[in-house]
């Protein structure tokens, strides 16, 4: 099997093929690039999933449940007006390339300029990327992806956590510091107010990310 299996990530066996047939999940282990992704992804016969890549290793994970999907949608609606005022554009999941053999598909992103149909977005064009944390993505969203985004020079990383069983919503906005690591720029829980002037003005209660 060629996929990297992080905590809770779907373990995907290579599809059965005739002996000797080329199997990208096997043959391309550790050497994935955007060019190869364009050629071989999505894998025929697999359910719809996210394909991300860390140092050439393909990472396959399920799409988010309704809680995170709604939270990401609300973040898009909250950020779109102030971001557009600066000439930026807000997007749901897209391919953000962080290196020759690295890419992520964040739950939402703010680009410095319109993507205009591009399939692969250079990390240099991303002002902010955001992830909604789920049990299957906790390690990646808290450790791996922030580290890769910081290394790529993306100035802001936003982490969103929601739970209906706990009536909990939390937003952490990280900003790239002088030493190349992310530092907490703004943070708030449901019932409080997240307020920031950078990268664009935002002021709202994280509880808005929970459905009524």
Predicted regions: what they are:
Residues 1-212:
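Gly/Pro/Ser/Thr-rich low-complexity, intrinsically disordered segments predominantly at protein N-termini
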């Amino acid at each position: 099997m060629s996929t990297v299996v992080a905590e809770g990530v779907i373990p995907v066996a290579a599809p059965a093929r005739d002996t000797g047939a080329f199997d990208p999940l096997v043959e391309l282990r550790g050497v994935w690039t955007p060019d190869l992704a364009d050629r071989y992804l999505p894998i025929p016969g697999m359910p719809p999933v996210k394909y991300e890549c860390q140092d050439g290793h393909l990472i396959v994970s399920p799409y988010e449940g309704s809680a995170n999907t709604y939270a990401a949608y609300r973040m898009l609606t909250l950020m779109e007006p102030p971001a557009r005022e600066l000439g930026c554009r807000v997007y749901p999941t897209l391919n953000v390339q962080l290196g020759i053999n690295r890419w992520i598909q964040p739950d939402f992103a703010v680009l410095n300029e319109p993507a205009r149909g591009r399939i692969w977005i250079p990390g240099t064009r991303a002002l902010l990327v955001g992830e909604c944390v789920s049990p299957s993505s906790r390690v990646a969203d808290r450790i791996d992806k922030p580290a890769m985004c910081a290394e790529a020079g993306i100035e802001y990383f936003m982490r969103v956590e929601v739970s209906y069983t706990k009536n909990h919503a939390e937003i952490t906005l990280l900003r790239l510091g002088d030493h190349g690591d992310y530092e907490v720029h703004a943070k708030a829980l449901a019932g409080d107010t997240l307020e920031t002037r950078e990268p664009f003005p935002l002021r709202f209660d994280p509880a808005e990310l929970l459905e009524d």
